[in-house]
């Protein structure tokens, strides 16, 4: 006899597990299916983000930055650190332990909220039935009033650089290096490529980033992207724009990459090569032919603004649907869908999803860029404030970057906040909160910010929009 549930969630990543917990909190009988096998040979909850994405990469970024600080920056503070070394296996083991603790935490939350967990592969059948193929190969069918598909995404592989043991790797493999490569190649100058490239560059690798596009960080504000390129290049990342990889050859524990750029065909040899050219939705063996769920032309599950698919009672969230492939976007979609299933009128504002690149300095933004607004014909006022003028940043010896606030010239409503600098991810969230409630630049300028803090840079940038900044000369006074 099949088991019946109010909600069955396929996938326990940041979208799926959050949706399952919220649905259970709302009194719905909920099940969640996960098949990912972790490093210990057991099913691990948390999806790509927790196991091989957001969390482990941040652990390595933090470890590598501490090493860099000890070697290069302590002396400014009067601290003498001699003979600083890095134990890469220990660094990677620390990362693995963090992942283990967090995946176990999700399992505990499932139990606390009454979510029934199934280990295996979930497949949507007709009439909202879900087939679960367990790790032992046995199958069972769950009956659901509602199904939430949260199957996530996987790294894109490219024919010119097929994965090869531990020489050519994707983002997952790049988290497991046991030694610092002397020469590291990275294909793709997006979020993943820049973050992973930064990790190994700080530890001493000679890093070359090959980006097919001629423009660096095209989704970011042009002023911020220009500053980021300058800073990351100074840190040692050799970022080659307009470099299209055409072939690769693994030989004698190295890989030779062939690419074309403005100077014609080029070749570079690396000890390791990371392929970080994006991700694609996971839909393999996910939908039975008679499930009724349709895919769009790019292979994503088609959904409306409330994540409804073409089948009533079937929803899809996260990386498997349109929009930014971000964990926080998936989680909030999960909450929205669970609440709508429970009869609430939940909404999600897709215009205010923050984006972050966790290099150092961090790069973060929310809302629209200046170039987008100008292309749309919107007249704007812009205020900027450099961290070089921030007392708190000076005290921390971390003065690279700036905060940029963009406001509508007619209404003064804030339309975008863009940051490159220390704690950019935290600062941009303050802007997002204000923008969610329709804040104006004047509103932000009238708020009292603690002193001395990095957040004062946001305050000053907001004041600068209308020519009222205190701690820099205003470009124009109003």
Curated annotation (Swiss-Prot):
<feature type="active site" description="Proton acceptor">
    <location>
        <position position="451"/>
    </location>
</feature>
<dbReference type="InterPro" id="IPR016156">
    <property type="entry name" value="FAD/NAD-linked_Rdtase_dimer_sf"/>
</dbReference>
<protein>
    <recommendedName>
        <fullName>Dihydrolipoyl dehydrogenase</fullName>
        <ecNumber>1.8.1.4</ecNumber>
    </recommendedName>
</protein>
<feature type="binding site">
    <location>
        <position position="211"/>
    </location>
    <ligand>
        <name>NAD(+)</name>
    </ligand>
</feature>
<dbReference type="GO" id="GO:0006103">
    <property type="term" value="P:2-oxoglutarate metabolic process"/>
</dbReference>
<dbReference type="GO" id="GO:0005737">
    <property type="term" value="C:cytoplasm"/>
</dbReference>
<dbReference type="GO" id="GO:0050660">
    <property type="term" value="F:flavin adenine dinucleotide binding"/>
</dbReference>
<feature type="binding site">
    <location>
        <begin position="34"/>
        <end position="49"/>
    </location>
    <ligand>
        <name>FAD</name>
    </ligand>
</feature>
<feature type="binding site">
    <location>
        <begin position="188"/>
        <end position="192"/>
    </location>
    <ligand>
        <name>NAD(+)</name>
    </ligand>
</feature>
<keyword id="KW-0520">NAD</keyword>
<comment type="function">
    <text>The branched-chain alpha-keto dehydrogenase complex catalyzes the overall conversion of alpha-keto acids to acyl-CoA and CO(2). It contains multiple copies of 3 enzymatic components: branched-chain alpha-keto acid decarboxylase (E1), lipoamide acyltransferase (E2) and lipoamide dehydrogenase (E3).</text>
</comment>
<feature type="binding site">
    <location>
        <position position="327"/>
    </location>
    <ligand>
        <name>FAD</name>
    </ligand>
</feature>
<dbReference type="Pfam" id="PF07992">
    <property type="entry name" value="Pyr_redox_2"/>
</dbReference>
<dbReference type="InterPro" id="IPR050151">
    <property type="entry name" value="Class-I_Pyr_Nuc-Dis_Oxidored"/>
</dbReference>
<feature type="binding site">
    <location>
        <position position="58"/>
    </location>
    <ligand>
        <name>FAD</name>
    </ligand>
</feature>
<dbReference type="InterPro" id="IPR001100">
    <property type="entry name" value="Pyr_nuc-diS_OxRdtase"/>
</dbReference>
<keyword id="KW-0274">FAD</keyword>
<feature type="binding site">
    <location>
        <position position="245"/>
    </location>
    <ligand>
        <name>NAD(+)</name>
    </ligand>
</feature>
<keyword id="KW-1015">Disulfide bond</keyword>
<feature type="binding site">
    <location>
        <position position="319"/>
    </location>
    <ligand>
        <name>FAD</name>
    </ligand>
</feature>
<dbReference type="InterPro" id="IPR006258">
    <property type="entry name" value="Lipoamide_DH"/>
</dbReference>
<dbReference type="InterPro" id="IPR012999">
    <property type="entry name" value="Pyr_OxRdtase_I_AS"/>
</dbReference>
<feature type="disulfide bond" description="Redox-active">
    <location>
        <begin position="49"/>
        <end position="54"/>
    </location>
</feature>
<dbReference type="InterPro" id="IPR004099">
    <property type="entry name" value="Pyr_nucl-diS_OxRdtase_dimer"/>
</dbReference>
<keyword id="KW-0560">Oxidoreductase</keyword>
<dbReference type="GO" id="GO:0004148">
    <property type="term" value="F:dihydrolipoyl dehydrogenase (NADH) activity"/>
</dbReference>
<keyword id="KW-0285">Flavoprotein</keyword>
<feature type="binding site">
    <location>
        <position position="122"/>
    </location>
    <ligand>
        <name>FAD</name>
    </ligand>
</feature>
<keyword id="KW-0963">Cytoplasm</keyword>
<comment type="similarity">
    <text>Belongs to the class-I pyridine nucleotide-disulfide oxidoreductase family.</text>
</comment>
<dbReference type="InterPro" id="IPR036188">
    <property type="entry name" value="FAD/NAD-bd_sf"/>
</dbReference>
<dbReference type="InterPro" id="IPR023753">
    <property type="entry name" value="FAD/NAD-binding_dom"/>
</dbReference>
<dbReference type="Pfam" id="PF02852">
    <property type="entry name" value="Pyr_redox_dim"/>
</dbReference>
<feature type="binding site">
    <location>
        <begin position="276"/>
        <end position="279"/>
    </location>
    <ligand>
        <name>NAD(+)</name>
    </ligand>
</feature>
<keyword id="KW-0676">Redox-active center</keyword>
<comment type="subunit">
    <text>Homodimer.</text>
</comment>
